[in-house]
Amino acid sequence: MTRKVSTRTTWEPVAGYSRAVAAGDFVFVSGCTSTSGGEFVHEGDAGAQTTQCITNVAEALERLGASLADVVRTRMFVTDISRWQEYGRAHGAAFGETKPATSMIGVAALVDPRMLIEVEAVAYKPGVGA
């Protein structure tokens, strides 16, 4: 059995995806960007964008009964790899001692040219998908 959540953004129906899917003992969170209330926020600020992305990940997890403490894997897709320390510091601050496995991948662009980062996550929480 799977459970799914949507944020009702304009992108979800166009691309045909869910914000997060709980399956078995795992929650898979789609890439989150620096949006709040459907609007882009924190233009030019790599750290603040990273924090907002992770806030959006946390909100999706919470809707399925999980939290950032359950995250075992993240991927950060960034448009300017030279700012890796800014992204990394914000990621480290958000996850603290959880310290999930992570990758930071440089990409040419994201869906909005103002977006510097997109974060996806996988959480492990026994029974979450039941």
Question: Which positions does each model-derived feature cover?
Answer:
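N-terminal presequence-like segments and the immediate start of the first folded domain
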Residues: M1-T55, E59-V72, V78-A130
